[in-house]
Amino acid sequence: MANKATPHDANLVLKLYDLRREAEMRKARNWYMIEFWPQNADDVLKVANSFPSQENAWMRQVGGYWDMAASLVLHGALNEELFLQPGISGEMFFILAKVHPFLKEIRAKLNNPDVFANIEKVAAGSKLARKRLERVLKNVEQRRKAQAKPAKKR
């Protein structure tokens, strides 16, 4: 273990957890995790450009939250090893995996290279993080394909 997590790190994680419990944030997370299954960059851009829809607000809220959390790690305010524990940042990997295959196109079409940049840096920043991202990407891709197929009739 390079740097041992401190009580300050633990308090920061608990504050991040409290932010995730806020009522509107729960709705936003629920939408992103369960209902939002983009099949391509245009599906993401449709929501990103549907200002001021509820889905647009939720996408910005979830993305902004995880970008903020990742920036704390990138700037040394939060211990990376602690942050990478599945119960703390597992959701971050999942939301990144949903847009990861389309990120280059999304960034180009929005003319914004910073979209998901901090999240991506943390997810690619260590061997442990890269292994998790690889695993989550695979799982999300299987789920995405299942979501795209019409339900079979019995």
Model region roles, listed by residue range:
Residues 1-154:
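Acidic, Ser/Pro/Thr-rich low-complexity regulatory regions
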